[in-house]
Amino acid sequence: MAGKLFGTDGVRGVANFYPMTADFATKLGMACGAELCQVYRKVAIARDTRISGEMLQSALAAGFLSAGVDVVLLGVLPTPALTSVTADLDVDMSVMITASHNPYYDNGIKLITSNGDKFDDDTTSKLEVLVAENKFDLSSEKLGRIIYNNEALVMYLEKAKSFISSSKPLAGTRIVLDCANGSFSGIMPQVFKDLGAGVISLENEPDGYNINRDCGSQHPEKLYETVKGAHAGIGIAVDGDGDRLLVCDDEGHKIPAEQLIAFLAKYLKDEGKYRGNAVVSTIISNTAMERYIRNLGFEYYSTKVGERAIIAKMQELGCSVGGEESGHMVVADYSKSGDGMVNALLVCLAWAASGKKMSEIFPLFKFDPYVFVSVPLKDRAMVAEAAASEKVKAAVSEAENIMSGKGRVVLHPSGTEPKLRVWVSGSDETLVKKSADMIIAEINKLQEE
């Protein structure tokens, strides 16, 4: 097994091609069963709506069962729902089968601890070794059983709405919801209707193939047009597994995630519900956000890119809110991980309480000039090569010199796709663009060599 399979969000690939094959999934189930399931001898498995989910679920379940571990099948469930209820299921771990915002033909496997957190790199590296060695101590007697659980969604919804004190707090609002034909389809529209909102639902009929197809948080064009055409007050989109959130105002303009993070932090603080005094984001968040957060009286901390790093820092600081520009936002008192629906509910509650239009509330602050581009490369090996390239490093140094030390350059390999992300910010928009173009050109040259 060549290379590191686990990225920042589990293992991903094209369904029925390595590593997203039934064979690999079965071996991974065996490895997890042998290494991680020693207390309850039980695991929970959920999946999103893509067509390959059932195949991978069956293969994973077979691996766990052969290792003597009982398998609790939860069916289709949003990722934040699984992280929310895992600790209440009396299992050693849970597994989410999803490729998040990717197209239907991709899929992935996320491993979740008994507390609803992600496993560390040491654990996933050990699992890779076990799968590669393929030497498992199996028995004809010690086999697991399948258990079907239809209560996980109900458990999640009870938690997800626990912070809502009145019965119809969204009465009189008109909201457009794009469910990305994913795991929140049929769930999120009903929750908002129950809270009094007038709801227009988009992309709410998954067929196994249409998940994230020209919809959801990564493709919100239809959302924007619908909000404007329907004279709605707000537009909300999630991705296929429900851990990302995108919001647009009543004029169909996207509200960047950094603005939403600051908005939620301020709302919870004003309501007297903020725990701690810090807000966490990443090294590629806009510098204007940091200034705004500090001006609100918070301390501001940045981490490397990725939800796991953000959550770890939030746990260390004991604070309520963290997130990143990708749309992953965590409100720790109400969710274990990025939860598109919970965060959308909080945004809507704050908006409804303000009595203002969303376009009157946002923007909270003006962004400093920046360029953020994900450069697609041949494979992950080329991503690593580009990140380590002396020529690319020289271009980064030259860019920093061009901006006279008043800018910031970050190169970050995607943890889920063969892309190298380039982020450049500074006070001079022309110099920022020139610097970014220079770095991107150097990266692209590597593909031509």
List each language-model region with its residue ranges.
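An N-terminal, well-structured beta->alpha segment
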Residues: 1-62, 66-67, 93, 146-175, ...
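N-terminal small/polar loop signature for handling phosphorylated ligands or for N-terminal nucleophile
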Residues: 34, 42-106, 190-248
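Short glycine-rich phosphate-binding loop at a beta-alpha junction
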Residues: 41-48, 174-176, 277-283, 421-423
